[in-house]
Regions:
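Alpha-helical transmembrane segments
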Residues: 135, 139-146, 170-173, 195-209, ...
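Hydrophobic alpha-helical transmembrane segments in multi-pass integral membrane proteins
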Residues: 165-171, 224-232, 313-320, 445-460
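Transmembrane alpha-helix boundary signature
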Residues: 34, 57-70, 96-106, 168-170, ...
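Positively charged, small/polar-rich N-terminal and surface patches that mediate targeting and assembly
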Residues: 508-568
Length: 568
């Protein structure tokens, strides 16, 4: 529902999430670089626009994308047409990825520094096809109910195996492209599709089965792009037409243009990113399902809010953070202390992740369907910590040298080990968190930092060493989120309904004791906390599974109940 209170709450949270970015920029600019940026006013205005745009974007998600995505999934599940679900999954994956802005940036950079071997359009097609294929695999897993870690571990083995065949120039790029395929708009819709299917199909759990599609969308491009690299480096000769790396980096973040044409061009770019999603939804809703969308007016308003909010969000970033972040990265490489570079990389990773719109949306959904067992703010902190560690470690690799494959293999080993330790409900969310963290805000800043470091440090190759930071930013959140799950499980954190659950044996003994001792209050320990219930009631209502009906009946009689009514 559209209401002012919801928007104001989202606005408050948006500016709270931007605070870490502001503090990081101010600290490094004033304390380390010791200069006041020339464009500080535009940066300030840009941050304000980012905050408002983020709030509008999130409101649009809640009103438009989440409801229609979950509704479509439910309709397909009720229809029982697996073929149409699979086709819909592929179209959503392919159609939303091919126009992804972050993918456009990385593909253009790769084409520019590969001596013409890599074609930007072909690379985008390869990645888009791999994401469509990934969503199909993820939907098939939900339908069949197979545990996600079987697929993920197999995927990791294939990724590592592919590195032994692909040229070293393509490995870092392939790992990075696994992180840029999930956009700010795609992530919520894909998550809604998975959660909607898992909520509708009998025997599926939305927490255990609903998440995971984003993880597949991050994994498969690494495999497909490496095989594409084998082809281009085997059969395509390098051309003499190549843009210098330093020039290419600068041109990816031009000074923001306030002209009407530039503003309209930016808005058109966002519309192009969102319209394919809307087109796919309308086609399947009206042509395949032959069913009108409920609350169509609200859904269209929601999509309009997503477009306006995302456009404002990007304008705000271009006005301040993009150019400032790249300038600071170049200034820091001239500093004698590598520790400052690592600290800046980690701080940028943490602050941009906390402001990532798609992470906020997914964290809210995780809290909702986990009955509050997963705290959305703490989940975001865990993800941001993982990104921070990953980017700092990635910067360390660029500065000191080293093969990215060894770092990635060790990271995968940690992920696999934690998969068998962490509670089941957190594993799909942890896998998804790796893809959620690298989209609108993070990718341009992190890519610029990596290529800037590789360009300015002697002995480094921008194509081999410059890419890879996004891969680190995608890998380590999986580790920190699983660790968060282990900690919450050890602490005995319960969901809202679990907190109120009363075990039958404890209820029976407590009521019997109260009756025999003439007590006015009954004490039940239940879930480790002492609950007190006033004995001023004529009936007790207990919710139990069907198989426990006889046990509940016996417990009530032993407690002295004069009658028992069972409602199923």
């Amino acid at each position: 529902m559209l209401n002012l209170a919801s928007f104001l709450q989202l606005l408050k949270e948006s500016f709270r999430d931007l605070l870490p970015i502001i503090l990081v920029i101010m600290f490094f600019q004033l304390a380390i670089i010791q200069t006041v940026p020339e464009n500080w006013l535009s940066t300030t205005i840009g941050l304000a626009i980012v905050g408002v745009g983020l709030a509008v974007f999130l409101l649009g998600l809640e009103v438009g994308i989440f409801p229609v995505g979950e509704g479509l999934a439910a309709d397909f599940a009720h229809k029982g047409s697996t073929g149409w679900i699979i086709l819909f999954a592929f179209m959503i994956g392919f159609g939303t990825t091919v126009a992804e802005p972050a993918l456009l940036v990385i593909a253009d950079k790769a084409a520019g520094i590969s001596s013409g071997r890599i074609d930007a359009f072909t690379l985008r097609m390869v990645v888009a096809f791999s994401v469509g294929f990934a969503i199909v695999i993820g939907v098939w897993r939900i339908i069949k109910g197979t545990p996600i870690h079987y697929y993920i571990i197999t995927g990791y083995i294939l990724v590592v195996a592919a590195t032994y065949f692909s040229p070293k120039e393509i490995v870092g790029l392939a790992f990075d492209l696994g992180g840029v395929t999930t956009s700010t708009v795609t992530v919520p819709l894909v998550a809604a599709l998975g959660i909607g299917l898992a909520s509708t199909i009998k025997g599926r759990n939305p927490v255990l089965d609903g998440f995971g599609l984003i993880a597949f969308a991050s994994l498969t491009p690494m495999i497909f792009v490496q095989f594409y690299g084998v082809y281009v480096y085997q059969f395509i000769e390098a051309s003499d037409i190549v843009m210098p790396v330093a020039q290419h980096i600068v041109e990816t973040a031009p000074a923001f243009n306030f002209s009407l044409i530039a503003l309209l061009k930016g808005l058109l770019g966002v519309i192009v990113d969102v319209v394919p999603i809307l087109g796919v939804i309308l086609f399947f809703q009206y042509i395949i399902l032959k069913k009108p969308i409920e609350n169509l007016k609200e859904v269209l308003i929601g999509f309009a809010l997503v477009i306006v909010g995302l456009d404002a969000f990007i304008i705000g970033l271009e006005m301040g953070l993009f150019s400032l972040g790249e300038t600071m990265a170049q200034q820091l490489t001239q500093n004698d202390s590598n520790v400052i570079i690592y600290t800046f990389a980690g701080a940028i990773g943490f602050s941009t992740t906390m402001a990532e719109p798609s992470l906020t949306a997914i964290a809210r959904k995780a809290k909702e369907i986990s009955d509050g067992k997963i705290n959305d703010f703490v989940l975001r902190l865990a993800v941001a910590l993982g990104v921070s560690i990953g980017i700092a470690l990635g910067a360390f690799r660029i500065v000191n040298g080293g093969d990215i494959v060894y770092y990635i293999i060790v990271g995968y080993m940690f992920v696999i080990a934690l998969t068998f330790i962490a509670p089941k409900y957190i594993i799909p969310i942890a896998y998804d968190s790796g893809g959620v963290t690298t989209s609108t805000v993070t990718v341009p800043l992190v890519a610029a930092l990596g290529l800037g470091l590789a360009t300015n440090i002697p002995g480094r190759d921008p194509l081999i060493d410059g890419f890879g930071l996004i891969a680190f930013a995608s890998l380590f959140p999986m580790i920190t989120v699983m660790a968060y799950g282990v900690i919450t499980e050890r602490m005995g954190v319960k969901g809202e309904h679990e907190k109120e659950e009363i075990h039958l044996d404890e209820l029976r003994h407590a009521l019997a004791d109260a009756e025999n001792m003439g007590l006015s209050t009954v004490h039940v320990h239940g879930t480790g906390k002492r609950h007190s219930y006033e004995m001023q009631f004529s009936a007790v209502h207990v919710i139990v599974p069907h198989e426990k009906e006889e046990a509940a009946l016996l417990a009530a009689k032993e407690a002295g109940a004069r009658g028992v009514t069972i409602m199923s």
